[in-house]
Amino acid sequence: MVSSITRIPGIPGDSPSEAEGLGKGIESSFGLNLIPLPANPLFGTDGIRGRVGELLSAPLALQVGFWTGIVLRNHATQIGPVILGQDSRNSSDMLAMALSAGLTAAGLEVWYLGLCPTPCIAYLTSISDAIGGVMISASHNPPEDNGIKVFGANGGKLPQILQAEIEAGLRGKISPIAKVSNCGRHYSRFELVGHYGDALKKPLNSTLNLQGMKIVLDLAWGAAVGLAPSVFTEMGAEVICLHNEADGDRINVNCGSTHLDILAATVQEHNADIGFAFDGDADRVLAVDNTGRQVNGDYILYLWGRHLQKNQQLPDNLIVSTVMANLGFEKAWQQIGGKLIRTAVGDQYVQAEMQRTGGMLGGEQSGHILCRHYAVTGDGLLTALHMAALVKEAGVSLAELVDQSFQTYPQILRNVRVTDRDRRLGWQDCEPVQQAIALAEAAMGDSGRILVRASGTEPVIRVMVEAANAELTNYWTNELVSKVQQHLMD
């Protein structure tokens, strides 16, 4: 319904003369009065993320908003609004308003959606004349963290080269190319979230409903509360909800996509067909089958990929995933004629590779799933709807579908907390850790994989070991974690 989501006329910057005046009177206040920033890049694998009151603050959000506005305007073919939303964290109001102030200082109109899933921002940005979108959320992180995710006019994550331009502005390395003669305006557009809900249901409405299915939803006290239950109910499902209030103190706490135990128990207690757990901003989802077994992103990609393959909707039988994808998944997918391409961890890298190769399905083991037939970015609600529809159409339980798919290789992922940001991001310079990795890789050869990396979203170093048997997996995980703790922890 693009026609009903058009820009309110009369915003500054419509005329060439106004566009040429971008930045007047504010270059000194935003370009010279810099705030302290860490030595390493601000933008990680999913935007800017950190502890509120430490890395993230209202002054930082104000300047991020301003420089985001400047960069979006400089690269826009015509001036339009920026769409802004947030999750339920207590700090999200503060950061959203500060960021909006920065965007309007850059002469841009802001459409503020309030509480909404991150994919809602991406979808509305892609179908309207918006020149970008911003989501205030730290996704699956704890309540005391928050983050800033920036989207381009196409609804995809902002390219790294433009992220670098924003950061250069924040660090005082560039000045606005043009100047702003007038400030923008801030408009509340809460009604637009409903357009996103309609878009989620549209591909399924004409062919399939969820009548007769009992589905448990864990909303993680986050951005999907309200919207997710209504969408599943309108599709005909009987819905049981967990953690279905917007609660900034409890978002992601022992619930959602990183804590599936309560969801699994509830599915079994109510004899439900399937359960879905979302993270705080609902851009990712994990499932629980009817027996209470956890179903991660590898299984979701395999099952959805096989469905698309059978319907000749998967070009080159290609799935794009990351280095975290299980070897069991890869080998099983290859056995049915599939091809798997791995990227670095982060849905922005998956999305970029899908665009490069023409891939239509991709995602991460952690539950970021993108199907370009229906969306422009990873979408937890859309993925959950299509997985439920897939089970309904198959006429068998999700447990049976999983049993018929593949056996995973034993894989252990351990997180080692390293609060010193520079030490964490520079872990590769630690010789003892590198020597331990080399020793482990030589010992396992082709029978396993090792991945050590600094998280782009949390203050941890992740150690992943995957091997043909559990004994090897456990041994080398313990060895590597011990080295990281010994040489990198505070």
From Swiss-Prot:
Keywords assigned: Isomerase, Magnesium, Metal-binding, Phosphoprotein
The protein's enzyme class: isomerase
One term of GO molecular function: phosphoglucosamine mutase activity
Origin superkingdom: Bacteria
Post-translational modification: Activated by phosphorylation.
Catalytic residues of the enzyme: S139 (phosphoserine intermediate)
Cofactor note: Binds 1 Mg(2+) ion per subunit.
Positions of post-translational Phosphoserine modification: S139
BP term (GO), one: peptidoglycan biosynthetic process
Record-linked InterPro entries: A-D-PHexomutase_a/b/a-I, A-D-PHexomutase_a/b/a-I/II/III, A-D-PHexomutase_a/b/a-II, A-D-PHexomutase_a/b/a-III, A-D-PHexomutase_C, A-D-PHexomutase_C_sf, A-D-PHexomutase_CS, Alpha-D-phosphohexomutase_SF
Named cofactor requirement(s): Mg(2+)
Pfam families: PGM_PMM_I, PGM_PMM_II, PGM_PMM_III, PGM_PMM_IV
Catalysed reaction, written as an equation: alpha-D-glucosamine 1-phosphate = D-glucosamine 6-phosphate
Record-listed Mg(2+) binding positions: S139, D279, D281, D283
E.C. numbers: 5.4.2.10
Gene Ontology CC annotation, any one: cytosol
Gene3D superfamilies: Alpha-D-Glucose-1,6-Bisphosphate, subunit A, domain 3, Alpha-D-phosphohexomutase, C-terminal domain
Family: Belongs to the phosphohexose mutase family.
Protein role: Catalyzes the conversion of glucosamine-6-phosphate to glucosamine-1-phosphate.
Protein name: Phosphoglucosamine mutase
Protein's gene: glmM
